[in-house]
Structures are given as structure tokens and as C-alpha cells.
Amino acid sequence: EFCQIIVQEVRNVTGFDRVMLYKFDNDGHGSVIAEEKLDSMEPYLGLHFPESDIPRPARKLFASNWIRLIPDSHCEPVTLVPAINPISKEPTELTNSILRSAAACHFEYLHNMGVGASLTISLIKDQKLWGLIACHHQTPMYVSYELRKACEFLGRMVFSEIASREETEDFAYRRQLAYVQSALVEYMSQEENFVDGLIKHKPNLLNLADAQGAAICFGNTCTTIGKTPVAEDLNFLVQWLKNNVQEEVFYTDSLAQVYPNAERFKHVASGLLAIPISKRNYVLWFRPEVIQTVNWGGDPHNAYELNQENGLRLCPRKSFQLWQETVSLTSLPWKQVEIKAALELRKAIVNIVLRQADELA
């Protein structure tokens, strides 16, 4: 609702035909989470767009500039004279110039969308591009300096509110996980076997990572709770982790992509979060497969087409019509706060195991 108010107000202020709030995911793909437009225009709300539509170099430029204006997507770019800076002997740096022309490929992309002018407001969090407010007009449209500065200010203020809301949600969840972690440490300290402390009480190991299954593989025994792969599959998985993972934490929401044998137990473990207690001992959390239907703005597998006119070259796709993809072999993604909680638990387990070993010595 808040994001919808944002795009409505930006459209009221700027007069553009379409205004979208576009959010990036961890893979660089983006989705339209709010939209305000002319009734006659095709809706993009809820559609996903592949990373190749706004590739890494373009995202880097957006992260360096709060505002990007293209008043006429059909204009002829003007050559910079001289092309090489006579002092630095390098091409003139235009990253922060409002007059910097867009790449020919981007102009073609806008033409294919029926866009005559665009204004883009960057939403930047921790010096990284979180998303964009994208304004499109069907005909050329100039935006004055005063209005551009107003949009820049609006973008900063709006994203400050978005970031604050996200942090409030994260804080509540962090506090919940901190309580679970504290309880687990207390339970482990009270039990003769730390494994009992992780699974025999409430809250238990599952609550630390919002998992549907978990396993504590210690020595030659795997103790499980919830929905997990069978013992034989667990043993092979632990062996694979020993041979292939050196990090303090390993996590994936598509285990079958890196460990093909996981496809046979995808219904319980398409997602894996794993922490090593030692070279041979692991704590594992599992999430089941969640089959999703993703709505794309055009086929993401054909983001670029080959054009043989004037030589062979890549050009943007011409269709942005709804293209549905069914995504399988994936779970809900692990949140960073859950991964950090698992790492904190790892430290606590190591300390308790060492202390218990000293007491037995």
C-alpha cells in the first residue's frame, strides 16, 4: 500500500504516463511491486524481468546517480569533442553527467517497450542499488532541473521510509531468533548430551531457522527432528559436505543444483542450511520444495535476440508479454538473519562441547 502511494504521487508530480517501483532480488532480477499508469497501457505490475534487462554495469551507474533522464529515446547522440581528454589521455569520465547518452542497446530496449522518454530515480541502500522508481512516457518529455531535484529528494525520503520499515520487520525477527538461541544454549547447558538440548524442548532447533526438518550429525549418528531425508541420504549428504564445503556456513535454496542426488528427497530438502561443528560433525536444517509460478515480462531465456542486419549483433527482445515459468527444485530462501543465528549457535555448540570434554577429562 505504501509503495502504491509512492508511485501515485510521483506520477502526479511528474506527469509521466507510467510510474513503476522496481525492486531487485539477490540474483539481479527485478520485479514491479507497484505501478500507476494510463488505463490504456499494458500493466507490468507483478511481472519479473531478468538480470540482463538491467545488467551489472547499468546497475552500477544507477547506484552512482540518484536521477537518470532520457528526454527523447529517439534522439541522435552528439559526439563529444575531443573524445580523449587531452590532460588525462583517457576517455572523458561521464558517469555523473546528466548529459551522458544511453547505450544504443538501451535505446532499442525503450523503443521495444514503446517508451519515448524515461526518468529513473535510484533507491540506494548501504551504497547498493535496492530498486528504482521508473517513469515512462510514450512521447518525448523534458523534465526541468527543479523537478529533477524534487524527484531526487523524494526518492531519498521515500527510500528512507522503506528502509525503516524493513529494518523494523528485521528487528522483530532478530529479537525472536535471539530468544530461541538463548533458550537453546540454556537447554544444551542443562543436558548431559547437547543434542538433547537442541531437540527435546520448546523452542527447538527448527525454530532457529524456520525449518521443517533438522539433523545433528555427530560421530556416526544423525539425530533428526521434523521432516528430513532418510539416514542413508543424510550420510551421503554429510560426506558430500565434508568433501566440498570449507566455509563456516553453507546455505542454498536449490540443493539439487549443486548436489544432484538431492533431487530424490526434494520434497523434504530442496533447501539446506549447514554448519560444521568439526570436520566430521554437522548441524543441518532443511526446507521442502516450493513449486512457484513466476510471471515474467517476456521470456527470460530469450532476453536478447540475434539481429543479422548490418552484421551479427545482440539486440533486446521485442516482446514483453506475460510469460509464465514454473520453478521447481527450490525452497523458500534463507534469510541473512537466520544464517547469522546459525553461526552464533555454532559458536555456542563448540564452546559447550569443549567444556563438556574438559569436564570428562
Protein language model regions, located:
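Regulatory loop-to-helix N-cap segments in sensory/regulatory domains
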Residues: S97-S101, H136-E152, R165, L284-F286, ...
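GAF sensory/regulatory domain recognition
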Residues: Y22-I84, C217-N243, E247-Q257
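Signal-transducing coupling segments at domain and membrane junctions
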Residues: E76-V115, S254-L272, I291-L306
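Allosteric cytosolic regulatory segments
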Residues: E152-F159, L343-K347
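Flexible loop/coil segments at beta-strand boundaries within sensory signal-transduction domains
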Residues: D27-G28, I124-L129, Q138, I275-N281, ...
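Short hydrophobic beta-strand micro-motif common in sensory/regulatory domains
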Residues: G116-I124, S270-P276
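Signal-transducing coiled-coil/dimerization helices and immediately adjacent hinge/linker segments
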Residues: F2-Q8, A163-P229, T326-A361
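A conserved hydrophobic secondary-structure block that centers on an alpha-helix together
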Residues: E1-G28, G116, D126
